[in-house]
Amino acid sequence: MGPWWALWLILTLPQILGGQSPTMPQGFSQMTSFQSNKFQGEWFVLGLADNTYKREHRPLLHSFITLFKLRDNSEFQVTNSMTRGKHCSTWSYTLIPTNKPGQFTRDNRGSGPGADKENIQVIETDYVKFALVLSLRQASNQNITRVSLLGRDWKITHKTIDRFICLTKTQNLTKNNLLFPDLTDWLLDPKVC
């Protein structure tokens, strides 16, 4: 094994074994601090884009509520609730903080060996109105990229939606990967990205 091969292996093996770790997308500043106590509470998932979703999935998914409950050990217990017809679907998981501000790994304890590792990064937030969240997961030889737009209420500014679109573009997501909101005729402010 030559020195270049060894260097390549050293640099890529952690990502191959551990999944992808979010890096700060172009046009977004690295968080220098993250205030978990301000982030906790109820959020509405107002925007969702995912590279595995297609236009035909839109009728199946729509805005939903997510609750971030801060535990004593700085982990978040996350509970999601979505209505589907006359039924309410709920699912929960734990987010474990990493050493980077606003970055977490999703706890897969109990999921068994080989469970998918998911890295989640709060890219941007003001804590009171909106948050942009990037999730990267390696599953069955497929990289899954998800971008979420969270709001404290159902109203969101045009600038925030533009920032959401900018973040999806940095992740090579297209309008076909946007599940909601419907942005078919949206005109992006070119000064935002």
From Swiss-Prot:
Keywords: Disulfide bond, Glycoprotein, Secreted, Signal, Transport. Disulfide bonds join 88-193. Its main location: secreted. It is found in: Secreted. It holds the Pfam family Lipocalin. It comes from Rattus norvegicus (Rat). Residues 1-19 form the signal peptide. The keyword Ion transport does not apply. Monomer. Glycans are attached at residues 143, 172. GO terms for molecular function: retinoic acid binding. Belongs to the calycin superfamily. Lipocalin family. Binds all-trans retinoic acid and may act as a retinoid carrier protein within the epididymis. May play a role in male fertility. The keyword Plastid does not apply. One of its GO terms (cellular component) is extracellular space. This is Epididymal-specific lipocalin-12. InterPro entries: Calycin (IPR012674), LCN2/LCN12 (IPR003087), Lipocalin (IPR002345), Lipocln_cytosolic_FA-bd_dom (IPR000566).
